[in-house]
Structure formats: structure tokens, C-alpha cells
Amino acid sequence: MSKQPRKQRKALYNAPAHARGKHMSATLSKDLRADIGKRSLPIRKGDKVQVLRGDFKGHEGAVLGVDYGSYKITIEEVTLSKPDGTAVFLPVDPSNVMIIDADMDDDRRIKNVTGDN
């Protein structure tokens, strides 16, 4: 395993689909950490997050989409308005958000979080 930044970036850009999900993780709020027993989880559509960095710091909203190609997520309240007045979602890096409420409707995700096989 190389530690050269260029090779690390290349590995990130050329990562297979099953490995990209691990890179799309965000920290959990203190309440969720206590409940789940983990520090971070991969982000999913439907999770409620809070933005920690950038112009939209402090905004909360549900995750509307996860783009594994560009490693970005779109959040409900994080929008910009175009000159014609239409709203456009601003892509946010998952490292800049904190999961406030994880969507636990999926049995596979519950098993993944709890460690039950």
C-alpha cells in the first residue's frame, strides 16, 4: 500500500462500487453514538443530517440523494437559487455533515449496525 497522495487519490477515483459506500460515511450525533455504539455510519437516502462546515453550517434536512460517482450527497434544505429563480441542490461532502437521525427501516442496515449475522 502506497502512501503517495497521487496514488491514494487515484485509488479513490477508481474505487469499485462496493468500496465507495465506505468512503461515504459521516459521524453520528452523541445520542446516536450512545444508542448504536458506533462513531460513524455510511450515509443513506432518508437519513436526517446537520451540516457542520461551509456556508450552510447549522442547516438540517433529510438526505435526498447519494452520488457515489462524485462522493457527494444532496440535502433537503441546502439549495442555491439560479438567476431565473429555480432552486438547485448544492452537493455536499459527507465528511462535512453529522447524522442526527439514521433511517433504520432496512433490515440489512439494522443487522450491519448491530453486528447480528
UniProtKB/Swiss-Prot annotation:
GO terms for molecular function: rRNA binding; structural constituent of ribosome. Keywords: Ribonucleoprotein, Ribosomal protein, RNA-binding, rRNA-binding. Coiled coil: none annotated. It comes from the Archaea. Residues 1-28 are annotated as: Disordered. Transmembrane segments: none annotated. Signal peptide: none annotated. Pfam families: KOW (PF00467), Ribosomal_L26 (PF16906). Residues 1-10 have a biased composition (Basic residues). Belongs to the universal ribosomal protein uL24 family. HAMAP family: Ribosomal_uL24_A. This is Large ribosomal subunit protein uL24.
